[in-house]
Swiss-Prot record:
This is Urease subunit beta. Pathway: Nitrogen metabolism; urea degradation; CO(2) and NH(3) from urea (urease route): step 1/1. InterPro entries: Urease_beta-like, Urease_betasu_sf, Urease_subunit. It comes from the Bacteria. Its main location: cytoplasm. Gene3D superfamilies: Urease, beta subunit. The gene is ureB. Heterotrimer of UreA (gamma), UreB (beta) and UreC (alpha) subunits. Three heterotrimers associate to form the active enzyme.
Length: 101
């Protein structure tokens, strides 16, 4: 075994199966790239990203853990979000929630 190695069963693995998802169109209106990590509360991302922010409350990017999506200046792209799990409480980030969703 290699440190950090993950051994899985053969076959296809579905991430976030059975969880609510949401598709949004996101535009970077700023003059600098914005990168958003896999577990960042999307409602609280950089204000230069323009999208239906209220709809994104309680969601994160539906991508593999440890990865990110980069939005270049002026770029518009469609992303899929997945509902946060666990206690559904959010603390930190930009401090816009600081408690249960």
């Amino acid at each position: 075994m290699i440190p950090g190695e993950i051994l899985t069963d053969d076959g296809e693995h579905v991430l976030n199966a059975g969880r609510a998802t949401l598709t949004l169109v996101v535009a970077n209106t700023g003059d600098r790239p914005v990168q958003v990590g896999s577990h960042y509360h999307f409602f609280e991302v950089n204000d230069a990203l323009s999208f239906d922010r209220a709809a994104a409350r309680g969601f994160r990017l539906n991508i593999a853990a440890g990865t990110a999506v980069r939005f270049e200046p002026g770029q518009t792209r469609t992303v899929e979000l997945v509902a946060l799990a666990g206690d559904r409480a959010v603390y930190g980030f930009q401090g816009k929630v600081m408690g249960p969703l």
